[in-house]
Amino acid sequence: MDAIKKKMQAMKLEKDNAMDRADTLEQQNKEANLRAEKTEEEIRATQKKMQQVENELDQAQEQLSAANTKLDEKEKALQNAEGEVAALNRRIQLPEEDLERSEERLNTATTKLAEASQAADESERMRKVLENRSLSDEERMDALENQLKEARFLAEEADRKYDEVARKLAMVEADLERAEERAESGESKIVELEEELRVVGNNLKSLEVSEEKANQREETYKEQIKTLANKLKAAEARAEFAERSVQKLQKEVDRLEDELVNEK
């Protein structure tokens, strides 16, 4: 009987110990479940942040694409301005050639009409005025060409900076892909994900700064194109004035030649 009682007591003690272990394991299981739920919540929060960053990156890409489109439009406008300047150069060159021929005829008429000193002096004065105007037009056209060269340089500089922005954007996308892979590993990767999110945020700020600079350059291009358009109008007006002056000089030369013929 004593042996049975001892065995019963031992079994009861073992049962109590087993129940204690079961309670302990159940508590540990609950704690593990709580930690797992917390980890899942943190992962969901991290994924939500990643989605938000992806949305911001999509917006940044759209804004960058729009800025590139505007820059292309400005480059086309600059090319059109260059074409107009070239056409204006050709228009000015023709009156200059006519002016040279008229000057030769005027010099001949002046030599033959030495007696008509008053008419010859007036023709010489007109010739000098036209020469001065021609030189002034050439100087202004040179200045306009220099401004166009500067505008092309600024456009090339803008392309280079936008290439740099595109490279940084590709780096950000690569960082995001790696961050998504690390997010799947659970709680141990959350700290690394948060650090990468901070890096992505800094890159987004850099993109925003680059976009703001691009907008500023766009406004500068608009002002330059407006200035070039005004200068083109002024140059065209000067060219028309030069053409009228050449026509007037041609008439004067014809008149002097007629007088010379009549005197002979």
UniProtKB/Swiss-Prot annotation:
Pfam families: Tropomyosin
Region (Disordered): 1-56, 92-126
Keyword Acetylation: yes
Residues spanning the signal sequence: none
Taxonomy, superkingdom: Eukaryota
Biased composition, class Basic and acidic residues, residue ranges: 12-45
Coiled-coil regions listed: 1-264
UniProt keyword annotations, A-Z: Acetylation, Allergen, Coiled coil, Muscle protein, Repeat
Residue numbers carrying N-acetylmethionine: M1
Tissue: Expressed in muscle (at protein level). Expressed in claw muscles.
Example of a GO biological process term: muscle system process
Gene3D superfamilies, sorted: 1.20.5.170, 1.20.5.340
GO molecular function, one term: protein homodimerization activity
Subunit structure, interactors included: Homodimer.
Family affiliation: Belongs to the tropomyosin family.
Domain notes: The molecule is in a coiled coil structure that is formed by 2 polypeptide chains. The sequence exhibits a prominent seven-residues periodicity.
Physiological role: Tropomyosin, in association with the troponin complex, plays a central role in the calcium dependent regulation of muscle contraction.
Protein name: Tropomyosin Cha f 1.0101
Organismal lineage: Eukaryota, Metazoa, Ecdysozoa, Arthropoda, Crustacea
